[in-house]
């Protein structure tokens, strides 16, 4: 055994020794000796782009233009040395980036890109502008063309501008500088640009000079045009402008901001202070400072410009590697430059697309599960506007001769929406050396799909992959492993998982076009969430105050399949809307209710709802964009608000009318938010656009399969009693043998009771939630926990607990006699939370009937807490008791209350009344029912009383003047004397009469039959007694007071006899 191991090690050493001497690690199989360079040629001419490659023969060369392979033609010929000749050049056809590709038996490599520029017709992108200056000033004109190179010159008055004076300087970039202008410099200037294809002139700009009287005043130095920040390619010229004026003429000097000396070998001064570098190199990069100083003084001014000479360069190059089958290769490539270079990876001259085994992270290329086909050239291309650079490396895959053959006869069978069974046969060769199998699978559709791997032992030839997404095609292959390496991969098989119910519903967008409609729109679910082909949508809606839900089912159609208009709605009403989604397997859980208030009905024209778009930028911010709908209304601004699902709205953000975008920050990850936007005008707020968005989760550990657990599904709640609800749910399908637990969240559905939320922890998939309030609507949600991770909450379900029979009797039972044979009984609802009463039962009977068990029964609706007991017999004592009932049963009766009904009316006594608390006087709040007979009597009595009052007032006023002298006499027994004295008293005290008579007219209903101090108005019975001192008028029937003493001892309120009328006034406490 030891000799075998030593022999194997010797084989590996020999392989590495041979490879090193063959130049593999030195990389000598293929290279470029000459690469194409940037070139500019006139249209109609020809150009030769050079390219020569070396390596192991045979080596062939081909060319690409803008990434597309070039085919030879009459104008395009491939020369024998690999160069490319292009004749009869045209800008539209031939201008672009060229690249040569060399290949041999080991693979292919590409060169860097060379730009071919065709000089065409020039067009001015900037024209000179007119100037008006004083004599002796500095003039500056500039122009620019759309392409370079171009020769630029200047003309004055359509003649060439003489440049024999050092006052005039023309820069290569098209700038004309004239120092110390004189009258002969006045005129019209224009710019002339020329190349091999055209010659063009700019618009004219006139220079107007203003004469100056007397000597020029002293001026501090001023830089009119300073250096600009510029990026320049290697070996190209660059000019840094510095034009200054002042009196006396300032001196211009240059320096570097980093205090390094300026390279004078390539730099020179152009004109009066402009710095020119003829051929830029990398060390010329830096910040250059122009300084204008007044001679002999310390007065100066400066201007700075940055020169960037940083073409792409590689600071870390990929290295060639040798790896065994099923190993992992990593290539690194880091580049720098300005602008920042973009890195592209190539394999054998073709751009690499990431897939299951090939990934790119931070400009690094990683290849896992290496197969023989990965043996190739790998290149890193760094490119920006200043150029490109390429680095080449090689991956060599070493294979063992004794490796097993690939597994055979791969077969896949679908088990469910998330599981597929794989079966295979052992390798045909060296099957006894297999120690394990590796199953590789990935999604078949799309790009950049991640490849997953499952390793199993060699004792089985089947495996269930149960962590798949529903309704997806998956591709599988298997690799057999032995101690020395891996087999070739097996044939690939593709299998489709079954559909499932959708994982969630789309986000809804709600807008109103009128006060009576709501437009509901949504985006189609992505395949990961739909878990199959969506067949229908179910839209449910109701008002916030009504629990009756209306639903409409919408089959999926090609057109307008993602919106629906709810019509015939109520204006200014809050509607709750939710959605369910269906595949052919079944319906998803409905979404949470989304609220939307329909607009008010108004004759004023307000802005329509804008079109709203929401896009999560990251886990804590969302981009909000809106587009105002076409309207004639002048928009004065926008209002934006947002809030998490289930919470009240935050403050409103007001935005100006020109803003159509806003970013909401500081959000929580994995939370559903409601966003609302409306436009407002002078007529008020417009229609509102409402949409929801879910923030994604923040990035966590990469390559973690369970980055987020799915929530429990199929949550179902059923009321078990008045205080308990049975809750059940399903565990989501995912492959993990780890134990899971669940959290149940429940609480009243009313937002005002949000603080009453409770939680239950359980490891089962069902729980009995107890301790609930009867007849209360509760909401329930469940989440899953596993390995210190938690899923989102499941969709909320709602359930109302059952009714509970009344447990206590009605309270505050009171009985009051309001007529000789009629009593009023009132009560309060039993003191029991959330109690629903359907009806009340009133039992009453006289004592004799009670002993005989003969009760009379009255029933009143649950909203009524009063009843009239009629046809009571005088001289009896009645017993009364009440109970409450609902659909769940009857409650207990209250304590018995007695009511004594007198046989004869008596003087000065109130009617007999009683209650459960033995109170002397009963105040009855609210309305009670009066039958038609009693109401007719009350109306007749009120009419008689009002007639008497009007007659009395008329008599009092008519007798005032004639009865003054008799005002001091006592009241006589005759009716005319009584009326005479009443008129005399009214004459003496007219103000009191007015004050006292008015209250009598305020009572709507007065019992004219007498016998009670109980008044009945539109609100019910009113007790006339009071503990405060007040004035009172009383009208009673009486023949005559016999003497003064009797009048003092009797209560005027109780003097009631038929046949006589007495009008009394007094103060009482």
UniProtKB/Swiss-Prot annotation:
Cell compartments where the protein resides = Membrane
Q: Which Cys-Cys disulphide bridges does the record give?
A: 51-100, 143-191, 242-290, 333-380
Q: What is the lineage of its organism?
A: Eukaryota, Metazoa, Chordata, Craniata, Vertebrata
- The record's principal subcellular location, in a coarse class, is membrane
Which organism does this record belong to? Answer: Danio rerio
Domain Ig-like intervals: 30-117, 122-208, 221-308, 312-396
Q: Name it.
A: Protogenin B
Instruction: Give the domain of life.
Output: Eukaryota
Q: What is this protein's function?
A: May play a role in anteroposterior axis elongation.
Which protein family is it in? Belongs to the immunoglobulin superfamily. DCC family.
Sequence intervals crossing the membrane: 937-957
